[in-house]
Amino acid sequence: MKQLLVIIKPFQATAVLDLVAQHEVEACFVDEVKGYGRQKNNLEQYRGSEYNLAFLPKVEITIWAEDEIAEKLAKEIAQVAHTGLMGDGKIFMTDAAWPEAMEF
């Protein structure tokens, strides 16, 4: 089992989630987050507002999937979300056991 933590630009979320829906994953969660990568301390226009790149809005998608599916999905997400511009995003893949959860 692998956990994918995908950080992308908000406008790419629909395309990435459509791709995730085509694969058998154990779970998928989506959050709106802010943060920075290597581009910190630069100003950029985003939807008519100026942002310090240290805290641009992003979408975080957390996915749990079997190893083979996760590897394939990570490559496909990278292709779909890539624009070639700074701040496209990151994909972190870690080994994970399915956590014990209390369902209610």
Q: Which residue stretches match the model-derived regions?
A:
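Positively charged, small/polar-rich N-terminal and surface patches that mediate targeting and assembly
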Residues: 1-104
